[in-house]
């Protein structure tokens, strides 16, 4: 075991500080889906995502937000409807590559490579970028959840089921059935979250993921 700076402990398997417990070898968290049925694949991939939970953050609130997000993705999300908000048509068939790429992305976000080690520099920076994106995604998910817990709010349905907050962002989508809130604050919130969610979908489309 090696101590790296104040509050940081480095072991063969992980680097632990006040914010993260980052893993060094992510291979055991990857998924070999050979011979698995679709149902088995979904269960196995879900377990892999949940096993990464301790490495997302040392803060219980962040870990709980991560678990809530993964649960929503697997149990409730209408992904084709969500993608349609950016004009991308896809069916509801299981795309294993998207799930595996998403798992790899989260694993990178939870892994550590010393940026000072020559050829590993770009890989380390890639991992850092994944970690920053995941952090932002979970922050936005937490904030949206906070808004949906308020009384008399329709935002839960908008954020998780209708995705109407992205309609004004994507001008090609007809938004006649959607009236933005009269409150400037609520309208701004919807615009900000709509822009972020749209960017995540564009990233998914670019990297063949399903975040």
UniProtKB/Swiss-Prot annotation:
Judging by the UniProt lineage, the source's domain of life is Eukaryota
| InterPro entries per the UniProt record, alphabetical | Irc19
Membrane-crossing ranges are none
Please provide the Gene Ontology terms (biological process) for this protein.
Answer: ascospore formation; double-strand break repair; mitotic recombination
Any idea which UniProt keywords this protein has?
A: Sporulation
- Outline what the protein does: Involved in sporulation and maintenance of the mitochondrial DNA. Is probably involved in a pathway contributing to genomic integrity.
User: Family assignment?
Assistant: Belongs to the IRC19 family.
Name this protein carries in UniProt? Increased recombination centers protein 19
Q: Which organism is it from?
A: Candida glabrata (strain ATCC 2001 / BCRC 20586 / JCM 3761 / NBRC 0622 / NRRL Y-65 / CBS 138) (Yeast)
This protein's encoding gene: IRC19
């Amino acid at each position: 075991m090696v101590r790296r700076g104040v509050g940081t402990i480095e072991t063969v398997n992980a680097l632990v500080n006040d914010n993260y417990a980052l893993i060094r070898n992510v291979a055991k968290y990857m998924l070999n889906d050979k011979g698995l049925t679709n149902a088995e694949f979904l269960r196995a991939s879900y377990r892999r995502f949940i096993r990464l939970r301790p490495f997302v953050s040392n803060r219980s609130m962040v870990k709980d937000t991560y678990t809530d997000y993964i649960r929503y993705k697997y149990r409730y999300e209408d992904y084709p409807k969500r993608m349609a908000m950016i004009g991308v048509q896809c069916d509801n068939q299981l795309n294993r590559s998207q799930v595996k790429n998403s798992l790899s992305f989260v694993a990178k976000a939870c892994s550590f490579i010393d940026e000072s080690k020559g050829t590993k520099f770009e890989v380390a920076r890639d991992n850092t970028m994944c970690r920053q994106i995941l952090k932002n995604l979970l922050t936005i998910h937490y904030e949206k959840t906070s808004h949906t817990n308020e009384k008399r709010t329709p935002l839960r349905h908008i954020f998780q089921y209708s995705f109407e907050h992205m309609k004004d962002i994507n001008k090609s989508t007809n938004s006649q059935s959607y009236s933005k809130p009269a409150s400037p604050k609520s309208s701004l919130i919807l615009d900000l979250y709509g822009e972020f969610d749209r960017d995540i979908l564009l990233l998914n489309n670019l990297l063949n993921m399903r975040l």
